Amino acid sequence: MTHATTDTPTAAAAAPQQPPALPAVLQQALAQAQAQGLPYAGSVTPLQAWPLVQQGQALLVDVRTAEERKFVGQVPGSAHVAWASGTALTRNPRFARELAALHAKQPQPLPVLLLCRSGKRSALAAQEAAKAGLTHVFNVSEGFEGDHDALQQRGHFNGWRFYGLPWVQD
């Protein structure tokens, strides 16, 4: 028995890989960001971010320093591209390039969720990514440790750890 072959590529093989449709929670964040005139794709809470990461619908990138990740804790399986380094938080001039390179290594294009301590540095990082032409880069509001409470302490009010989401510490 013989099989017919063709030298023309199939439509699926010829077409570039399209990113999957944004999950509804990210579509909502994007619409809200556009309505507010934010210079990046928008923000999601840790409780919104975790299911997306868990289901393989988004890539979680921790933008804190290596020291913060080591001594304060980190989300298992999260990628790392430092927005800044050292105790002076010296800005990483290669941040957007490093984030783009990390994203390009993924087997399929995914939205990126940036996580820092409180959601402030990750918002700046998302803005920088947008300026560099990266789309669908979102901030995780509240961050890993959360906002300050009335006593100026973190971790008692909101944030990744406060909600009991997965994390590990060296």
List PLM regions with ranges.
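Rhodanese-like catalytic fold shared by cysteine-dependent sulfurtransferases
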Residues: 2-58, 67-111, 122-170
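Structural scaffold elements adjacent to functional motifs in cytosolic proteins
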Residues: 60-62
